Amino acid sequence: MPSFQPIEAPKCPRCGKSVYAAEERLAGGYVFHKNCFKCGMCNKSLDSTNCTEHERELYCKTCHGRKFGPKGYGFGTGAGTLSMDNGSQFLRENGDVPSVRNGARLEPRAIARAPEGEGCPRCGGYVYAAEQMLARGRSWHKECFKCGTCKKGLDSILCCEAPDKNIYCKGCYAKKFGPKGYGYGQGGGALQSDCYAHDDGAPQIRAAIDVDKIQARPGEGCPRCGGVVYAAEQKLSKGREWHKKCFNCKDCHKTLDSINASDGPDRDVYCRTCYGKKWGPHGYGFACGSGFLQTDGLTEDQISANRPFYNPDTTSIKARDGEGCPRCGGAVFAAEQQLSKGKVWHKKCYNCADCHRPLDSVLACDGPDGDIHCRACYGKLFGPKGFGYGHAPTLVSTSGESTIQFPDGRPLAGPKTSGGCPRCGFAVFAAEQMISKTRIWHKRCFYCSDCRKSLDSTNLNDGPDGDIYCRACYGRNFGPKGVGYGLGAGALTTF
């Protein structure tokens, strides 16, 4: 009969007893009992979010940082405090106390050497998750993650990865690998003459780049020097390629970019100021935004020659009868057309027929004479006359002839229909109709039958006789009579 061998359960690193599946907790590849899964220093219960395993021992993040993290100014308990923790609470079992450097920082502990190319690039030891810092895809100890020159502590913001596979702070990186010369050392504006050790013991001298040394074919190179422009140094302007060194103002030699570059008529580039002085408008109020007279040594003949004036003749191309501009009769093209009352006008001709003020779709008024006018001229020519009309409440003295075509406010011609206006009998069109008790009226006929007051939907009253009245006349004709019912309360009407 075969013997039965039970599967051996894994052992807990804390107590050394077997751990079964119902009570196991995992950390760092080891299995712990649920009761043993707590910090080895402060005995705090742990979970998967706050536990840290180090050499088969469990710690909370705080205790792990205090025991294995860096020591010194800014690292103890919280940033910005001086930690005097010398590790005395971490005495070994034999009572040995680790030596202390400068009274605060622990001596480097013995670190196991990692295989070549896998450990910390500075010390070569294993890097655990609690203390690793990443740079150039490699893991560093937090203690080793400092500038290779000034030994300043670094982080992900201050770290600069150098071509020599080391890390530096920004200042040391700029001094060692950045550009040299006036304006580059220590933030610009200072002459830097630092000499760094080279193979020959002398500083490197950077030769000036001669961009026109390699000439391009005519019409293909840089417009300023004629040299070939490569992709690493090209600047584009108006479809042409420039060297970055040559892309400056032709007059003041100010360095340009895509924002302040202006293409001149001479196919060169200028800054905005020089472009405005040379090609912009001249006169009072135009000089770079200042309110003074700018001459800049230019005569009126030179200014006129640079800015020729062209007055187009709109009558040179005649249109067919009834199709051209109503004012000049010339053909109107799409780029210059203005629309008014179904007619097409030239933009130049679209002005008031009397005062010649330029018009637009807001100011234009179509007159009965087939022409267009501004509002003021339209009111003077075709508007009502008399006291209170016109531009001011003044009495207008004219020839004495009335300008109103229909003095009684009623149409004089047209077909009379049975369903027309109840007052005049003529047909009522949609543009002028007013509705009252299922009957349609002209707008001019829509007034009180007694006092001739104009009516609307708010003061309209339909009388029993089929006519319309205002409220006062309706009450006077059809309302109750007696004390308190007249035009006002408490008045006796004798109708």
Curated annotation (Swiss-Prot):
The gene is Mlp84B. It comes from Drosophila melanogaster. GO terms for biological process: muscle organ development; muscle tissue development; sarcomere organization. It is found in: Cytoplasm; Nucleus. Residues 12-63, 120-172, 222-274, 325-377, 421-473 form the LIM zinc-binding domain. The keyword Repeat applies. In the embryo, expression is restricted to the somatic, visceral, and pharyngeal muscles. Within the somatic musculature, expression is localized at the ends of muscles fibers at the point of attachment to the epidermis (at protein level). There is no expression in cardiac mesoderm or in fat body. A motif (Nuclear localization signal) lies at residues 66-71, 175-180. Keywords: Cytoplasm, Developmental protein, Differentiation, LIM domain, Metal-binding, Myogenesis, Nucleus, Repeat, Zinc. GO terms for cellular component: cytoplasm; nucleus; Z disc. It holds the Pfam family LIM. PROSITE patterns: LIM_DOMAIN_1, LIM_DOMAIN_2. The keyword Nucleus applies. GO terms for molecular function: actinin binding; metal ion binding; structural constituent of muscle. InterPro entries: Znf_LIM. This is Muscle LIM protein Mlp84B.
